Amino acid sequence: IEKDQWDSIDVEVGMHEYPLRSFGGTGCTCNGRHFMGTGFYRFSLDWWAEFDGKHWHERTPVPGKTRTLAASAATEQYIYVTGGTHYGGVNTTGEVLADIRRYAPQTDHWTYVAVLPEGLINHVCFTIGKRVYIGLGETSDWQINDKLYWFEE
């Protein structure tokens, strides 16, 4: 990026208003396709969408409890969405989630993978080859997590 020169694009919504007005979502690129979702707008969200550079295309929502502050990462075939906080509304304290969900872009299908040893928020998720790493961040009792977990596809 040269001397802080940024370009912006006008995004045509094509979906409900809340995806673009939410915060705390997650997103990543899988095999050249760009996905994002979850987040918070009055309550935790489960939406999932593909962005082609100009238009949003609604996809199958993330199953399980709605979430904000989740993390995601992709391998060549799948996207993994992990952890986050479930808020049922603005007056709830939230529940830190520990589940791992796998999304297959080629079939628009979600699969439950596993439960982490503890719920995590503000954490990282990344891949090296077929190994998925999840950790750091904060636990359900707001303690700093110094663990990094991993599994292989």
Map each language-model feature to its residues.
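Kelch-like beta-propeller repeat domains
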Residues: 1-153
